[in-house]
Amino acid sequence: MPIGVPKVPFRSPGEGDTSWVDIYNRLYRERLFFLGQDVDTEISNQLISLMIYLSIEKDTKDLYLFINSPGGWVISGMAIYDTMQFVRPDVQTICMGLAASIASFILVGGAITKRIAFPHARVMIHQPASSFYEAQTGEFILEAEELLKLRETITRVYVQRTGKPIWVVSEDMERDVFMSATEAQAHGIVDLVAVQ
């Protein structure tokens, strides 16, 4: 039986009364975000707006993005990544559970030295995919060209942020490569594995 989103007490600075807010609202106020679903336009826009708002509010205090996601839409994920690079505060990324596909791209986008994986977390990288079987030939060719550009961009970012040679990253992206937290650290996707 679902319990909904839990409520927690919160007292605004300078106010005497405590109010009850949903737990995510409370955590956002502490600069903690959660990506716990497929990456799509809606969650992407929510995370982007929170990062921008909180970076304007205080640009010297780190933001924390906790990730447990199977991936999702490439463009929406790239928008989150770009925002993480754009905002002034460092964005620390923490993988808890799974960071697969575009979610691993978001994970690697955290501030270098501030990318963490929980001990039993899993990370998966692969190349971007599409559903060609429904497309007309002309659309198929255009979509294939766009996918190739996206793959080149994603590969370039992984190379830059992991320090791995392009041939290693390209080879790994040919198929689904699942990694443990320590393997992701050896790959340069995360910097630290949280202590058990």
From Swiss-Prot:
Keywords: Chloroplast, Hydrolase, Plastid, Protease, Serine protease. The keyword Transferase does not apply. Signal peptide: none annotated. It is an enzyme of class 3 (hydrolase). One of its GO terms (molecular function) is ATPase binding. One of its GO terms (cellular component) is endopeptidase Clp complex. It catalyses: Hydrolysis of proteins to small peptides in the presence of ATP and magnesium. alpha-casein is the usual test substrate. In the absence of ATP, only oligopeptides shorter than five residues are hydrolyzed (such as succinyl-Leu-Tyr-|-NHMec, and Leu-Tyr-Leu-|-Tyr-Trp, in which cleavage of the -Tyr-|-Leu- and -Tyr-|-Trp bonds also occurs). Its EC number is 3.4.21.92. It comes from the Eukaryota. The active site is at S101, H126. Transmembrane segments: none annotated. GO terms for biological process: protein quality control for misfolded or incompletely synthesized proteins. It is found in: Plastid, Chloroplast stroma. Pfam families: CLP_protease. Belongs to the peptidase S14 family. Component of the chloroplastic Clp protease core complex. Cleaves peptides in various proteins in a process that requires ATP hydrolysis. Has a chymotrypsin-like activity. Plays a major role in the degradation of misfolded proteins. This is ATP-dependent Clp protease proteolytic subunit. The gene is clpP.
